[in-house]
């Protein structure tokens, strides 16, 4: 299986962004880990807490490459995070955490707080994490599980699933689903939009009436090998383009549309430097090479 992912993290109406996303991809171990943290309002240095937790958990994965992914591995990573930073700082801070650790066809999903994880299969949400939230006597919601909040209630809920080709895992902070647009968000996640459009559609929904930072990771599980020679050509073309323009990171699992002998492939790319999405179209006639059009420049490719 091959994993594609895309992210966004925006400040919204707040003065600073306390959300943080960290990703580690380890193709030699057929393993990836994705962590999203949301620094808690009302605590000092929420942006510091979210970065510390996300980076430390990801670093734990890269420092322990031979250790199989497991519930205990997640708990050990969380415990090490707490020990490392509690020993360094007494400053009040807090953060939620939601993560996906994928190894082969197994995904471990873990969260504490109100950052959420969704699993979408065949255009249907088949799993949604449960928020760790309670109401005060006055009716205000409070987070009951988080890092660095002066209690030991940071142990995450952990769910193990077997992933299938076509599955998507969506991880987000509460700023994404908490703006009153849940119905539109759910329809989009379960809809039939091609994957390249999906992340930008979700980001647009999250930005409407945003009251908080909003961040998300969208992960797509794809097949390792293309199904036919035409698909093989497109995979090779994608690798060539990625190698010649490493500023752009493709996050799309290809969508094909046949028009007589022609094929049209639409590919979304995320520019790390510019923080924006770029849109490119590759069009080719079977057996006659390809043309890649991006940013009003056309590059001919006649490989195979």
What are these model-derived regions, one by one?
Residues 1-237, 241, 245, 257, ...:
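PP2C/PPM-type serine/threonine phosphatase catalytic domain
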Residues 20, 249-252:
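Short, polar loop/linker segments at the starts of domains and inter-domain junctions
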Residues 125-127, 250, 298:
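Residue-level detector of beta-propeller blades
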Residues 242-246, 254-280:
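A short, charged, amphipathic alpha-helix used as a generic interaction element across diverse proteins
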Residues 266-304:
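Short, mixed-charge low-complexity intrinsically disordered segments
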